[in-house]
């Protein structure tokens, strides 16, 4: 199989577990791994600390998070091509849009606890399973 495996990350340990599983799958499938982080707003904030001025940007922070995870995954899976990506919107929408954009063959998400039917999957996983343009793997990352 060639193509792309998409995985979403949000900085949590459970998301990293899903990303690690996705890297293992991408390695076995000889596929590119795209590590995706979402940001809801396009906020930019200027912060002054002493004589320093910092510009904090949501999009930049989301991409930085994806890059940090990509670096760790490259160390653990040196044969896998890992590419970070970020997008603006709800996580499930960003993941689905990226999967459509690259023609992904697999989208990997972790499960999280929610109420009702979504408790089994979590709201992001539930939405991705029902709307993704490709196969979806839900990794059991939380009970």
Can you annotate each of these PLM segments?
Residues 1, 14, 72-107, 143:
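Structural beta-alpha unit
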Residues 2-52:
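Small/aliphatic-rich secondary-structure junction motif
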Residues 18, 45-48, 94-97, 119-120:
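Short, well-ordered secondary-structure micro-motifs
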Residues 36, 83-87, 137:
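General small-molecule cofactor/ligand-binding pocket signal
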Residues 37-38, 110-112, 140-141:
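Short secondary-structure boundary segments
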Residues 52-65:
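A short acidic, glycine-rich active-site loop
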Residues 106-127:
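Glycine-rich, Arg-bearing micro-motifs that act as flexible, cationic patches
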């Amino acid at each position: 199989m060639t193509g792309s495996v998409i995985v979403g990350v949000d900085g949590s340990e459970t998301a990293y577990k899903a990303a690690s599983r996705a890297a293992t799958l991408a390695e076995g499938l000889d596929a590119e791994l795209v590590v995706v982080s979402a940001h809801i707003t396009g906020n930019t904030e200027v912060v002054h600390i002493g004589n320093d001025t910092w510009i904090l940007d949501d999009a930049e922070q989301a991409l930085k998070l994806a890059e940090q995870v990509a670096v760790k995954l490259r160390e653990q899976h040196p044969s896998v091509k890992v590419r970070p990506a970020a997008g603006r919107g709800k996580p499930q929408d960003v993941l689905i849009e990226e999967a459509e954009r690259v023609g992904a063959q697999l989208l990997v998400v972790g499960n999280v606890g929610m109420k009702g039917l979504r408790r089994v999957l979590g709201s992001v996983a539930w939405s991705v399973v029902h709307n993704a343009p490709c196969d979806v793997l839900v990794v059991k990352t939380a009970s």
